[in-house]
């Protein structure tokens, strides 16, 4: 700060000297105004020249940041017409006039009353004018002049950012550009060296350097290793005055991070890994993990693992866990303790991404030996085959041996084995198995035609550890035995035309027949068709075997007549090709029918039966007449019944009700009642229609619902009741249809008591039945009967 004050004082003195020099012409007289005008003659014949009067002044300067006790003298204004008698008044106007700059109106001296800052305002433009003090008449036209604020070095350099962050790859060459920092100085760059900056590094050597003029930071050491040190803190200084003494300075911090390159290979921390796996492990199960360390990061540190050698390459595999960068060794296929107890693997770890610039640092991989021991486990029994197929003939006697399954204990203990059948696969219990030797036998005869294949599951378990068990599928084929005779493939029926000719009308077969056999094809076709031996010479029909498992039935003669015989039953023997063969006799029905001249069937009705019955024409007419008379009687009965105004069954008005119980003798109870009036139930008008209550006046017009089904010819009581119940349940708009039972004696002394829901004794109680009015139309009648009790009492 001392240096700054001394510099300011020197600049002030320099400015004063400049100002004094500026006004020197007035004293010396060579800057006095001269008058330029017309010429006049003096007394002695001299020619006088009139000159224009003007200002005597120059451009003014003022030092910024002046802190003296008195106002700074900026300069002095003077006109050549000023004789010093005080008649001229100087006026100052313009920027800062009267506030920053003041003028002595007599002497013309200008002073700065405030401290000026060039960085806020570099110059001020003012107007000067001389006027007559008494009249304020301008003596000279106004003139403009400038007051410049002269700069001093009062602003230190400032960086654009307080801190910088930069990255540079590790192992970069010397001189690699890292980042450029820039500072600025608010001082005047055109005046002196106040704004001339020079950069230097204060912290960060010897790793980095900075260019003095540009501020570019560069690496200063080769092969900087990120794994040794990743982050550096550098301090950069910017100093004005060209870096000379007395200049002001500013600093900034730069954090430089070394980015990673793949300059390190993966490395296993140990040379041998020991692992173990149980022989009971399943493929895909993890055995263990290995990890090679790579100090690089990101993609440069990615490692992949492979098995490159060893006797366990077929039994084990390795995958890479990219989250943990570990090699996961898994079981590829089952291992057996009794077969091989140890394996050796050579595992390689290699970088995924390799930088060619650092290939000389390689190889970027490492290998390790992994030894895996197999641990013994209590294994379940093993069947000698993955599945079994056995055969047995159908109809074989119970206890017939079907086959055998065999399993053994793979462990060294060789525990005894016990066999059993999964009964979920043999629900009918067709088979049994010897638990000790595994022989499978039948328990009942089998039928191939029902099931040709039977599939069961057999379990084998260790006798000392039932939890150790194995299972195997066993397929049993039921072999066919010729135990089914062939039969007609369809219910065949033949037709033959009646005629007067004695020879057959056609050489075509009456019908072509074929057969089916439930047995296997070996015991089925070829089928042989023939007539039974006893009718081999049938005079009417014959059978010709077509030798293709079909046969044709032919007529041996003509002249068939329906009057003589309209139906023939022809037995046909069918034999199969089994050993021994099976045969059956099937009956073919052949009808004699009427045909046209072309042989087309016209009718095969039952006239022959009527004619052959021996009835005369008169008898037939009598039978038909009786039938007609009976039909006429029935029609008349129905017609008369419909024309009657009243139904056939008449009820008294008070008896027209549904399910009215009538006592033959009073007293007793409901056990003495007749439950139903069968006549009412038999009334056909009440089956599906609506029967109105004659003792109840309907509140609204009721639209009868159609019956659920048409009325039968004869009424069934049970169906009638169920139908009515279903209609009532499904009709929410139906009015209440109460069944009120009236008893002459309520039976207070009866042991059985009353089963009726409406007891007349309750009419004398004090119950309030007005709430029935709110229960809707179904309870309207009850509300009228019980809710108006008081009214009836009053009337009586």
Curated annotation (Swiss-Prot):
Source organism per UniProt: Homo sapiens
Which residue positions does Phosphoserine occur at? 788
Q: What's the name of the protein?
A: Cadherin-11
Phosphoprotein among the record's keywords?
yes
Which disease annotation does the entry carry? A chromosomal aberration involving CDH11 is a common genetic feature of aneurysmal bone cyst, a benign osseous neoplasm. Translocation t(16;17)(q22;p13) with USP6. The translocation generates a fusion gene in which the strong CDH11 promoter is fused to the entire USP6 coding sequence, resulting in USP6 transcriptional up-regulation. Elsahy-Waters syndrome: An autosomal recessive syndrome characterized by moderate intellectual disability, hypospadias and characteristic craniofacial morphology, which includes brachycephaly, facial asymmetry, exotropia, hypertelorism, telechantus, broad nose, concave nasal ridge, underdeveloped mid-face, prognathism, and radicular dentin dysplasia.
Q: Name one Pfam family in it.
A: Cadherin
Per UniProt, residues of the Cadherin domain are 54-159, 160-268, 269-383, 384-486, 487-612
Under the heading InterPro entries, the entry gives: Cadherin, Cadherin-like_dom, Cadherin-like_sf, Cadherin_CS, Cadherin_Y-type_LIR, Catenin-bd_sf
What processes in GO biological process is this protein linked to?
Answer: adherens junction organization; aortic valve formation; calcium-dependent cell-cell adhesion via plasma membrane cell adhesion molecules; cell adhesion; cell migration; cell morphogenesis; cell-cell adhesion mediated by cadherin; cell-cell junction assembly
Q: What is known of its domains?
A: Three calcium ions are usually bound at the interface of each cadherin domain and rigidify the connections, imparting a strong curvature to the full-length ectodomain.
């Amino acid at each position: 700060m001392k240096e700054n004050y001394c510099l300011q004082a020197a600049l002030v003195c320099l400015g004063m000297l400049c100002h004094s020099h500026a006004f020197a012409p007035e004293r010396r007289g060579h800057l006095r105004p001269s008058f330029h005008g017309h010429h006049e003659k003096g007394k002695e014949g001299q020619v006088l020249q009139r000159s224009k009067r003007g200002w005597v002044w120059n451009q003014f300067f003022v030092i910024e940041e002046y802190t003296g006790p008195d106002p700074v003298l900026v300069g002095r204004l003077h006109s050549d017409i000023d004789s010093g008698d005080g008649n001229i008044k100087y006026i100052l106007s313009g920027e800062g006039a009267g506030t920053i700059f003041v003028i002595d109106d007599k002497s013309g001296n200008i002073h700065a009353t405030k401290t000026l800052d060039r960085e806020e305002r570099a110059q001020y433009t003012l107007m000067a004018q001389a006027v007559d003090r008494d009249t304020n008449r301008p003596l000279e036209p106004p003139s403009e002049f400038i007051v410049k604020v002269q700069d001093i070095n009062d602003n230190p350099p400032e960086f654009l950012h307080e801190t910088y962050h930069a990255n540079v790859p590790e192992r970069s060459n010397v001189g690699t550009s890292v980042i450029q920092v820039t500072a600025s100085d608010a001082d005047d760059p055109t005046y002196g060296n106040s704004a001339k900056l020079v950069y230097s590094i204060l912290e960060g050597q010897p790793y980095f350097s900075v260019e003095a003029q540009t501020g570019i930071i560069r690496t200063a050491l080769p092969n900087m290793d990120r794994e040794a040190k990743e982050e550096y803190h550098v301090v950069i200084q910017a100093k004005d005055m060209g870096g000379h003494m007395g200049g002001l300075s500013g600093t900034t911090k730069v954090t430089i991070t070394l980015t990673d390159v793949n300059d390190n290979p993966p490395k296993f921390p140990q040379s041998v890994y020991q692992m173990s796996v149980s022989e009971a492990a399943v493929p895909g199960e993890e055995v263990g993990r290995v990890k090679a360390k790579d100090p690089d990061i990101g993609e440069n540190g990615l490692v992949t693992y492979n098995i490159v050698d060893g006797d366990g390459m077929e039994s084990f595999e390795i995958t890479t866990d990219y989250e943990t960068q570990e090699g996961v060794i898994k079981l590829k296929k089952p291992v057996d303790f009794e077969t091989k107890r140890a394996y050796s693997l050579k595992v390689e770890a290699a970088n995924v991404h390799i930088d060619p610039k650092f290939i000389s640092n390689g190889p970027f991989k490492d290998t390790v030996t992994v030894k895996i021991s197999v641990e013994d486990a209590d294994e379940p029994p093993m069947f000698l085959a993955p599945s079994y197929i056995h055969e047995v003939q159908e109809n074989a006697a119970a206890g017939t041996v079907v086959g055998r399954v065999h399993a053994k204990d793979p462990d060294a203990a060789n525990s005894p084995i016990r066999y059993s059948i999964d009964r979920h696969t043999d629900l009918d219990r067709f088979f049994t198995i010897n638990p000790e030797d595994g022989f499978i036998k039948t328990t009942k005869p089998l039928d191939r035609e029902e099931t040709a294949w039977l599939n069961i599951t057999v379990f084998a378990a260790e006798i000392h550890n039932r939890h150790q068990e194995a299972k195997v599928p066993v397929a049993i084929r039921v072999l066919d035995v010729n135990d089914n005779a062939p039969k007609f493939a369809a219910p065949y029926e033949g037709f033959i035309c009646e005629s007067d000719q004695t020879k057959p009308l056609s050489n075509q077969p009456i019908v072509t027949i074929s057969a089916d056999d439930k047995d296997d094809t070996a015991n089925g076709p070829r089928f042989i068709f023939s007539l039974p031996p006893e009718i081999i010479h049938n005079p009417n029909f014959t059978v010709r075997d077509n030798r293709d498992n079909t046969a044709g039935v032919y007529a041996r003669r003509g002249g068939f007549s329906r009057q003589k015989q309209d139906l023939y039953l022809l037995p046909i023997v069918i034999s199969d090709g089994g050993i021994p063969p099976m045969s059956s006799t099937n009956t073919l029905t052949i009808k004699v029918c009427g045909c046209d001249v072309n042989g087309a069937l016209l009718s095969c009705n039952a006239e022959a039966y009527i004619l052959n019955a021996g009835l005369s024409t008169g008898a037939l007419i009598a039978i038909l007449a009786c039938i007609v008379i009976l039909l006429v009687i029935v029609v008349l009965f129905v017609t008369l019944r419909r024309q009657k105004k009243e139904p056939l069954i008449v009820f008294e008005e008070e008896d027209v009700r549904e399910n009215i119980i009538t006592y033959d003798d009073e007293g007793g109870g409901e056990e003495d009642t007749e439950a139903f009036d069968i006549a009412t139930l038999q009334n056909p008008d009440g089956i599906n229609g609506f029967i109105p209550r004659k003792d109840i006046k309907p509140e609204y017009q009721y639209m009868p619902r159609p019956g659920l089904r048409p009325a039968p010819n004869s009424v069934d009581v049970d169906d009638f009741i169920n139908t009515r119940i279903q209609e009532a349940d499904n009709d929410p708009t139906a009015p209440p249809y109460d069944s009120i039972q009236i008893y002459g004696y309520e039976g207070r002394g009866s042991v059985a008591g009353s089963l009726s829901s409406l007891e007349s004794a309750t009419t004398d109680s004090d119950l309030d039945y007005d709430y029935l009015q709110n229960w809707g139309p179904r309870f309207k009648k009850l509300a009228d009967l019980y809710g108006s009790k008081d009214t009836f009492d009053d009337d009586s």
